[in-house]
Regions:
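Active-site PLP-lysine loop of aminotransferase-like
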Residues: 12-25
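Conserved PLP-binding catalytic core of the aspartate aminotransferase-like
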Residues: 45-57, 61-98, 108, 113, ...
């Protein structure tokens, strides 16, 4: 249901007919989307990304950081700290060493659960992953 004045209703009736009277996605759109999904799931980049995520998690354990990291299988990994000041301090130290980790502060997350977000990419090297986690281990 759409509410509005007479002019709005008339405009929508006259210029939105394909949307108003359509009940399903066109077949060609569904086929295109399916093809895109298949292409994305079969790419070498995706395999490399998954390998990097696995390596990141292994290095978290190697450097004994699992107590601060949220368990996640996604490319977005988060280390939780008890204070926003500590998150800012550690993030700044990482930036000084050319690592782009992002602080996530309250009110985006609950107070006392501030965190540093790490985004793992397919183009990251194992050396980069190891170095950032080594640095993090020296800062915590």
């Amino acid at each position: 249901t759409i509410t509005g004045d007479h002019r709005l209703i008339q405009y929508l009736l006259n210029f939105s007919r394909p949307f108003i009277y359509t009940t399903a996605m066109p077949l060609h759109a569904a086929v295109t989307i399916q093809f895109a999904i298949e292409m994305l799931s079969d790419t070498k980049e995706r395999e490399i990304l998954q390998s990097n995520i696995t390596y990141f998690k292994e290095m978290v354990e190697h450097f004994k950081l699992q107590d601060i990291f949220i368990n996640s299988a996604s490319p977005i990994q988060s280390a939780v700290f008890a204070s926003p000041a500590r998150v800012k301090e550690v993030t700044m130290k990482l930036k000084e060493r050319n690592f782009d980790a992002k602080p996530i502060l309250s009110p985006t997350v609950p107070l006392g659960q501030e965190r540093i977000r790490f985004c793992v990419h397919s183009y990251n090297t194992y050396d980069e992953i190891q170095e950032i986690l080594f640095l993090l281990s020296t800062f915590v």
